[in-house]
Amino acid sequence: MAATTMALSSSSFAGKAVKLSSSSSEITGNGKVTMRKTVTKAKPASSSSPWYGPDRVKYLGPFSGEAPSYLTGEFPSDYGWDTAGLSADPETFAKNRELEVIHCRWAMLGALGCVFPELFARNGIKFGEAVWFKAGAQIFSEGGLDYLGNPSLVHAQSILAIWACQVVLMGAVEGYRVAGGPLGEVIDPLYPGGSFDPLGLAEDPEAFAELKVKEIKNGRLAMFSMFGFFVQAIVTGKGPLENLADHLADPVNNNAWSYATNFVPGK
């Protein structure tokens, strides 16, 4: 008896939420009974959303007269801007879209990781080196590196051991993802839902569609923020909050232009 499984009619998940109904059983030829989730398609997001469809908000940039035909507003944060034609090929577009979402999420986590330790340290909470690009160097100190300043958690003394653990753990996860490992009841690898949505944020299709847009917006800002943190670390040797405090204390002498002029030849 074939399982009553409904396939999604669209390759995207933008503007839609998928709800899992109760499990249905399938009897295989060897007499075993397997269980799988039955997928039903929920009501799509309203077509009046300003973020989706042909009438969505657009930013075409200075070199584009109109949005290309392949950018239809089907996906979140599609503003119709693709002057270089990076999304013209559907397979490349799908890959780049996945990479952007992944990098957005990493950047948002990274930005928090750069700011919060310094914020805690400035408010009297000590847990080791607070400046993000200096924290890892503590492993070369005589006492090694204590995660969160607590030797009872992880006490690291070998950079090679840390590197090996990072390669094994992250490599295994990335390899599993790239190979398209079985995702169980997951419908969309970018927005898996189910156990990955304990707060039920995806239950309302319209709210979920808007949350996708907010995620990409904040993720793009986070990627720019991380780039700024990298440049600040190289130029000033300080953390983001210390740079901000210096700028607020003396904005005339502590700004991007004043630091840039330090690299002028002959100065």
Curated annotation (Swiss-Prot):
Residues involved in chlorophyll b 2 binding: 105, 154, 183
Binding site for chlorophyll b 3: 158, 174
Chain segments carrying region Disordered: 21-47
Chain residues that bind chlorophyll a 1: 81, 87, 100, 220
Annotated positions of the Phosphothreonine modification: 38
The keyword RNA-binding belongs to this UniProt entry's keyword annotation: no
Organelle transit peptide: 1-35
Residue sites binding chlorophyll b 5 per the record: 166, 263
Residues at which chlorophyll b 1 binds: 59
Modification after translation: Photoregulated by reversible phosphorylation of its threonine residues.
GO annotations of cellular component type: chloroplast thylakoid membrane; photosystem I; photosystem II
Keyword Transferase attached: no
Quaternary assembly: The LHC complex consists of chlorophyll a-b binding proteins.
Comment, domains: The N-terminus of the protein extends into the stroma where it is involved with adhesion of granal membranes and post-translational modifications; both are believed to mediate the distribution of excitation energy between photosystems I and II.
Protein name as it appears in the record: Chlorophyll a-b binding protein 22R, chloroplastic
Species per Swiss-Prot/TrEMBL record: Petunia sp.
Annotated gene: CAB22R
